Each structure stands twice: as structure tokens, then as C-alpha cells.
Design a protein with these regions (language model features):
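Beta-rich carbohydrate-recognition and catalytic domains
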Residues: 1-125, 133-223
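Acyl-donor binding region in acyl/amide transferases
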Residues: 128
Length: 223
């Protein structure tokens, strides 16, 4: 295929092993968790599963980070060359004392089950695996996984600056589907200039999602 021709695909990826990994956990980064009101080293365990978008000639990477107990929060890093990234010191998106806490906070914590180092995954929870697109109005739409220790549920949030986010709740709100295991929502986009922008197809936004299986969902307003 002619590499100059129009295509839906992004060809010619090349690993740059000389600088990989481009992000590592920084064990000294801390912030005050709004639920426990305690100091947390929010990415001391892992950094993984990022999403990226270009704004003003800068690559902004939203990435999942885990603390010692496996609570996931979303951090933000930026780069002017797409290879070397600088992190913000605190997460931009995290479980909070809000209506989404029931889906983002491990049920064991609510039941008072004591922490144990013998179970490294018992307390996994939080906000995971961001996917981001720009809307036609210029705002940013992020799908993410809310995890309460039992069920992964796709959720959605929006932002005008990639730092301050508004949560809009579960994507699959219907009682029939809201407790189904769902994650990894990828909204269909179209290239507009140098941006990938969410686009309606025959009047509807479309989203692929799923991990072990692939499904589709539709929306009239991206929310």
C-alpha cells in the first residue's frame, strides 16, 4: 500500500528500546488521599496502561498508577518529543468522596477487612486504564475502568484542560448491564487536521469495548 495514501491505520511503528521504558514508578511521589485523609505514595507499585493525546504541540499521557496496596489512580505526564516525559507530582484523577466511590473503592475496605501483605491483590481498586479522545467542541472525553475489587465497570469523565475532570458515572447505566464486567472503551474517531476527534457515524457515536470479548455501544452525546 502507498504509505502516502489515506488510511484508517497508523503504520510504521518502531520500538525505541534505547529509552524504554519511558515511564517508571517514582516511589517518592505522594498526595493526600481524600477518602482516607492520609498520605499515599500513589505510584510506588506500578505505572502502566497509558493513553496519549496531542495538545498545543505537546504529547499528554494519562497513565494508570498503583500504590502499595494496588489502588489505581491516573497520573499525567507530558512531552514535547513523544519520547521523554515529565510527570505531574500528584494524580489528576482518583477515587474520591463522590457518588462514584461505590464503584471505585474496594468493598473490603468498606467492610473493615484488615490489610494483609499475604494477599497482594486483595485490595485492588480505583480508576484504571484511561482511553481519551477529543470531542468536536474541543473538550476531552476519557473512558476508564472503575473497579471495586469485584467488578470492573466502564465509566466516563470529561475535561477542558486534561487536569480538572468531571465524572459522569457508568457508561452502561441500564440495570441490565451496569453490573456486567466491562472495560477498555475505545470511541471511534476521525482525523481532523492533526487531531483524532470523536465523530458520529450516521448520527451516532460508536465505541468498541471489552477485554476477553469485543462489544459495541452507541451514544448520542458521548456521555
Amino acid at each position: 500500500e502507498d504509505p502516502q495514501s489515506e488510511s484508517w491505520a497508523f503504520p510504521f511503528f518502531q520500538k525505541v528500546d534505547s529509552i524504554n521504558p519511558i515511564l517508571n514508578p517514582t516511589q517518592s511521589l505522594s498526595f493526600t488521599d481524600p477518602i482516607t485523609n492520609s498520605k499515599v505514595f500513589w505510584e510506588e507499585r506500578n505505572v502502566l496502561n497509558p493513553a496519549a493525546i496531542v495538545k498545543n504541540d505537546t504529547v499528554f499521557m494519562l497513565y494508570r498508577a498503583q500504590d502499595q496496596w494496588g489502588t489505581s489512580r491516573i497520573g499525567l505526564a507530558y512531552s514535547t518529543d513523544g519520547l521523554h516525559f515529565e510527570k505531574r507530582a500528584t494524580p489528576v484523577f482518583f477515587p474520591d468522596q463522590d457518588p462514584q466511590k461505590t464503584f471505585e473503592w474496594n468493598y473490603r475496605k468498606e467492610e473493615g477487612v484488615p490489610y494483609s501483605l499475604d494477599c497482594k491483590s486483595c485490595y485492588f481498586d480505583g480508576v484504571e486504564d484511561p482511553r481519551i479522545v477529543q470531542s468536536e467542541t474541543g473538550s476531552y472525553i476519557m473512558t476508564y475502568t472503575a473497579y471495586d475489587g469485584k467488578t470492573a465497570r466502564m465509566s466516563i469523565a470529561s475535561s477542558k484542560d486534561l487536569i480538572h475532570w468531571e465524572k459522569h458515572g457508568l457508561i452502561l447505566k441500564d440495570d441490565k448491564y451496569k453490573d456486567y464486567w466491562s472495560k477498555s472503551g475505545s470511541i471511534v474517531t476521525q482525523r481532523m487536521g492533526n487531531q483524532q476527534v470523536a465523530v458520529k457515524i450516521k448520527g451516532t457515536y460508536w465505541m468498541y469495548f471489552g477485554d476477553t470479548n469485543l462489544f459495541m455501544a452507541t451514544s448520542e452525546d458521548l456521555i
